[in-house]
């Protein structure tokens, strides 16, 4: 299997960061964090650029752009606008693919349109932006390379009831990113990091979540999805979760520490514990059912 992220990554002076989904939550926090760093430049994007008013308008190192990741034309236009703005110094050094939302509820109730739109945003949106960035990065003559953070989730590794299409999108990001990372020539110096945070203290549950119509067959309080909803609700009321600024700090640390980039980056103790538990159970099952699978 081809190795990935072979060489230490060195964040250049004057690096340009392109971040999607900057209107709120994690994306907003990362954009604000990068904007405070000297010798770093920022392309902050959102479907509605008026939501980026928290960033200054008169800083030549900060570019605010409209970007709908579900539109190929919108993605292409954003990259063209960035190239025009930064001119001869244009290069995409760091990408943070953060745009997305969660479709939650009883999977049996999901319409085709709801399911397709979720996957279109989470997965294909990430893929569109990533490949546009790869094109810019690999064409750099001095092999400056770059770093692409694809924001997955604990939900990209561990599945829970009531979020089937959200999991489908995040699991797809994980497998797709691993495959694309192995397609890169080592000389291109293009690095990938799949970010897997557990719960974050943002307005995600309210502003970045869409709910399917409830299904009467799953309405009872003892149904798994209802139990999970109650548990999550208690956690939100207690203030549980990762501070979004901690995610911004973690990503900047990965980019700037002059070391190899991890392909997977679980964030938070909950993510670490649950991912570790799943992998241990998977290894246990692998041995338990080895004879059942011994067919070749």
Where are these regions (language model features)?
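Conserved glycine-rich cofactor-binding loop
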Residues: 23-24
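SDR active-site lid
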Residues: 185-261
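Substrate-binding pocket helix/loop in short-chain dehydrogenase/reductase
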Residues: 106-107, 111-118
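Active-site helix of classical SDR
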Residues: 130, 169
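Residue(s) in the substrate-gating loop at a strand-loop-helix junction
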Residues: 153
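Conserved glycine-rich Rossmann-like NAD(P)H-binding loop of the short-chain dehydrogenase/reductase
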Residues: 37-53
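Rossmann-fold cofactor-recognition segment
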Residues: 59-73
């Amino acid at each position: 299997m081809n190795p990935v992220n072979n060489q230490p990554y060195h964040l250049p002076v004057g690096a340009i960061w392109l971040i999607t989904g900057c209107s709120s939550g994690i994306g907003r926090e990362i954009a604000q964090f990068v904007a405070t760093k000297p010798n770093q430049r920022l392309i902050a994007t959102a479907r509605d650029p008026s939501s980026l008013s928290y960033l200054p308008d008169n800083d030549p190192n900060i570019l605010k752009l409209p970007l709908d990741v579900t539109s190929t034309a919108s993605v292409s236009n954003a990259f063209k606008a960035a190239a025009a703005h930064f001119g001869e110094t244009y290069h995409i050094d760091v990408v943070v693919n953060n745009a997305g939302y969660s479709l939650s509820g009883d999977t049996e109730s999901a319409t085709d349109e709801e399911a397709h739109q979720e996957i279109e945003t989470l997965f294909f949106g990430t893929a569109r932006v990533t490949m546009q960035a790869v094109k810019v990065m690999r064409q750099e003559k001095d092999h400056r390379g770059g770093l692409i953070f694809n924001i997955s989730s604990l939900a990209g590794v561990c599945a829970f009831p009531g979020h089937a299409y959200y999991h489908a999108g995040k699991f797809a990001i994980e497998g797709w990113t691993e495959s694309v990372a192995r397609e890169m020539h080592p000389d291109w110096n293009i690095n990938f990091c799949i970010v897997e945070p557990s719960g974050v203290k943002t307005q995600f549950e309210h502003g970045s979540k869409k709910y399917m119509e409830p299904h009467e067959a799953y309405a009872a309080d003892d149904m798994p999805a209802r139990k999970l909803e109650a548990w999550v609700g208690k956690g939100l009321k207690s203030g549980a979760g990762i501070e979004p600024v901690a995610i911004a700090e973690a990503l900047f640390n990965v980019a700037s520490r002059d070391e190899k980039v991890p392909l997977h980056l679980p964030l938070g103790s909950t993510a670490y514990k649950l991912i570790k538990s799943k992998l241990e159970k998977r290894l246990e099952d692998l041995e338990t059912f080895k004879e059942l699978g011994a067919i070749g």
